[in-house]
Amino acid sequence: MTRVEYKHTEIAVKKKLGQNFLTDRNITRKIVAASGAGSQDRILEIGPGFGALTREILEVCPAFTVVEKDRALAAFIRQEYPQLQLIEADFLDIDLERLAAGGPLRVLGNIPYSITTPILFKLLENRRSITSATLMMQHEVAARLVATPSTKEYGILAVQLQTFCDVRYLFKVGRKVFRPQPNVDSAVISMVPKKNVAVEDAQAFSRFVRTAFHQRRKTLYNNLKDAYMLQAVDEGTLKLRAEALSIEKLADLFKLVQPLPAGEPPMKRDGRR
């Protein structure tokens, strides 16, 4: 079992929580600077750990909120930074809308590899409650977030986030600046919710995107025919794979299709059932 000690606290690293602690202060300074965080912001830090990022945020904002699930680390933060509002809980379980009742949140964090995708989707679902999110995550996941069409990285995650947020890959972080050292490199990204989006029904669009990318090697027709009415879509588009369409084209396609009523047979290419 790997153990990490800092000041008066020693913990057994929990792999299931994806715990890798950042040790390079230059990196934490870059993250805070890139976030644009200031004294007037309502800041939320996800998973402060031993406070590497926390102490840098305090340089620009004297009081903010942190969410920490690990009991020992929560006790450390409570003792080391009593001026902070500590929520000892799983970030995935907290009510972001309620937390943002006083104004939208600027989110920062070195987030666990193991739950990166659920965290991103929670932020996406609660995008009206945040100003921005500046997050460190596994490099491969960061690359998927900013992927472009017709690449192997381009998929559900890229489409969902880029439809509703401006996403930027900021910089890469090598694995040697963490304790314990992970087997992969990391990267820092930023996501800012868009004010105007091409899609109104986010949940319906999410279902559509998941269906369109369900089997990447299949055409849009084969992935969508059992779930949507496709009469309004030209045959040339239906012969393509989802990965070939830009964010804008997928949004346009979504507007053309209608969910297939329960019990209706799938659509044939000629428009008949």
UniProtKB/Swiss-Prot annotation:
GO terms for cellular component: cytosol. Gene3D superfamilies: Ribosomal RNA adenine dimethylase-like, domain 2 (1.10.8.100), Vaccinia Virus protein VP39 (3.40.50.150). It comes from the Bacteria. S-adenosyl-L-methionine binds at residues 20, 22, 47, 68, 90, 110. It is found in: Cytoplasm. It holds the Pfam family RrnaAD. Keywords: Cytoplasm, Methyltransferase, RNA-binding, rRNA processing, S-adenosyl-L-methionine, Transferase. InterPro entries: KsgA/Erm (IPR001737), rRNA_Ade_diMease-like_C (IPR023165), rRNA_Ade_Mease_Trfase_CS (IPR020596), rRNA_Ade_methylase_Trfase_N (IPR020598), rRNA_adenine_dimethylase (IPR011530), SAM-dependent_MTases_sf (IPR029063). It catalyses: adenosine(1518)/adenosine(1519) in 16S rRNA + 4 S-adenosyl-L-methionine = N(6)-dimethyladenosine(1518)/N(6)-dimethyladenosine(1519) in 16S rRNA + 4 S-adenosyl-L-homocysteine + 4 H(+). Specifically dimethylates two adjacent adenosines (A1518 and A1519) in the loop of a conserved hairpin near the 3'-end of 16S rRNA in the 30S particle. May play a critical role in biogenesis of 30S subunits. PANTHER family: DIMETHYLADENOSINE TRANSFERASE, DIMETHYLADENOSINE TRANSFERASE-RELATED. This is Ribosomal RNA small subunit methyltransferase A. It comes from Chlorobium luteolum (strain DSM 273 / BCRC 81028 / 2530). The lineage of its organism: Bacteria, Pseudomonadati, Chlorobiota, Chlorobiia, Chlorobiales. The gene is rsmA.
